[in-house]
Amino acid sequence: MFLWLAHFSNWLTGLNIFQYTTFRAVMAALTALAFSLMFGPWTIRRLTALKCGQAVRTDGPQTHLVKNGTPTMGGSLILTAITVSTLLWGNWANPYIWILLGVLLATGALGFYDDWRKVVYKDPNGVSAKFKMVWQSSVAIIAGLALFYLAANSANNILIVPFFKQIALPLGVVGFLVLSYLTIVGTSNAVNLTDGLDGLATFPVVLVAAGLAIFAYVSGHYQFSQYLQLPYVAGANEVAIFCTAMCGACLGFLWFNAYPAQVFMGDVGALALGAALGTVAVIVRQEFVLVIMGGLFVVEAVSVMLQVGWYKKTKKRIFLMAPIHHHYEQKGWKETQVVVRFWIITIVLVLIGLSTLKIR
């Protein structure tokens, strides 16, 4: 919204700063951060008053039983902060902004309904897996179709392989939709599975969003994208504003979500943030880079699939407990040790992902 102030730069030279993406990206992060910090205490009080306490699974780690009753659905604060900040600092004429907000809020609505059922019926399982998959699939397919339609040229419909500048595979509409679906739905569920310890998913989301913000800015800048041999995606620079808003909102939320957590983001936050990250990766054509930078999310999801699949086949478990962060808890790691060590791993993975900008 503030972008329109740049039109009055002829009257007041200083207003010209509002046309710069970098300035608006920084301000989007600070605005979302301030919003989360300002309304965090109020949100926690309201959730507590509404008795929106987390129902902890009795078959999980016994150390988690003390978390029973901790307010959940705090992700609604994150989504509100992202939406407000993006609308304030983003370009409303950019279709990517509306697609991202649409995906964020649509999957957030699913998560909200899931959390609501858990709170009202005291059922840790929430909505059925079938209902959740149908909703996520619908959002991913609609977003994929919209992004394919917006593709200005064939360069926006290719599969980029990191570290190899000569490998770029054309996808076509079917391939594009399949890849978009897997990326958006897969990341949404992976982040949700990761959100099992205080702050475990929140800070990695910040790191991955920051990394994708850099890719978005570069991809939306013709000279930079050509120099780094990345596909030029017109308008993708505005996506960086959405990403930095996500960074700020999650950092502000982490203030209250750090151990011992005063509030959990719940499915309303985790499902939405994951889907948004996946959508950003599709826009900038960096699905494989997302797999690298979000390696923690991938490992968490794969650990669950391996555990379930192997148990169904052999009635034995690969891990002491899945997702894998619970495995390390069962091995004797403190919750804070698991969280910080997984953060460190994510920092390394994001740096590796950023190295693909130049190493080709």
Swiss-Prot record:
Biological-process GO terms, alphabetical: cell division; cell wall organization; peptidoglycan biosynthetic process; regulation of cell shape
Annotated EC: 2.7.8.13
InterPro entries: Glycosyl_transferase_4, PNAcMuramoyl-5peptid_Trfase, PNAcMuramoyl-5peptid_Trfase_CS
Catalytic activity: UDP-N-acetyl-alpha-D-muramoyl-L-alanyl-gamma-D-glutamyl-meso-2,6-diaminopimeloyl-D-alanyl-D-alanine + di-trans,octa-cis-undecaprenyl phosphate = di-trans,octa-cis-undecaprenyl diphospho-N-acetyl-alpha-D-muramoyl-L-alanyl-D-glutamyl-meso-2,6-diaminopimeloyl-D-alanyl-D-alanine + UMP
Pathway: Cell wall biogenesis; peptidoglycan biosynthesis
Topology relative to the membrane: Multi-pass membrane protein
Requisite cofactors: Mg(2+)
Principal location listed in the UniProt entry: membrane
One example GO MF annotation: metal ion binding
Alphabetical UniProt keywords: Cell cycle, Cell division, Cell inner membrane, Cell membrane, Cell shape, Cell wall biogenesis/degradation, Magnesium, Membrane, Metal-binding, Peptidoglycan synthesis, Transferase, Transmembrane, Transmembrane helix
Regions crossing the membrane: 24-44, 69-89, 92-112, 133-153, 158-178, 199-219, 239-259, 263-283, 288-308, 337-357
Subcellular location: Cell inner membrane
Cellular component GO terms held in the UniProt record: plasma membrane
Annotated function: Catalyzes the initial step of the lipid cycle reactions in the biosynthesis of the cell wall peptidoglycan: transfers peptidoglycan precursor phospho-MurNAc-pentapeptide from UDP-MurNAc-pentapeptide onto the lipid carrier undecaprenyl phosphate, yielding undecaprenyl-pyrophosphoryl-MurNAc-pentapeptide, known as lipid I.
Similarity field: Belongs to the glycosyltransferase 4 family. MraY subfamily.
Protein name per UniProt: Phospho-N-acetylmuramoyl-pentapeptide-transferase
Biological source species: Neisseria meningitidis serogroup C (strain 053442)
